[in-house]
Amino acid sequence: MSIDNLRSALPSYAKDMNLNLSSLPRITSLSEQQLWGAILATAAATKVDSVVVEIATEAKEHLSDTAYEAALGAASIMGMNNIFYRTRGFLNGAYDDQRANLRMQIIGKNGGIEKLDFEMFALAVSAVNGCSHCVEAHEHTLREEGATKEQVNDLIRIAATLGGVAQGIQLAEALG
């Protein structure tokens, strides 16, 4: 299993990440699609090749082709949006009257899956990418769509865990 491969590759100083990663598949507040889509989207957002490959391999066992593509689409579109809106946030509203002029159709179509699920992926990726504007916007939409606080918290936990795992793997690969 690919999560097991990542766990084995983590150095001893990343034991906490090892244990946190092993607990992710046991999250019960999310459906299988929500869980594995969020895991895949956040892995993609880390930009660490080995993490993306290992998680993508395992995620294919749990997701339909449409959900798999939606998770990767969420990582891609939020990679753009997080930079755009985080930067505008730095500028304290000075450019809020300007149009983004960025194509974002995948968001309107929810990647072909349920809106709630796509929003979950977008929130988790935004957490990895550190965009407070996008985290707040997607959390608001999730709550309007009926997501529970436990679900939102678990999405943040997934993002934090994959971010920490990616850091540990990157260090192990760099230092040997």
Tell me what each language-model feature is:
Residues 1-176:
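Hydrophobic alpha-helical segments
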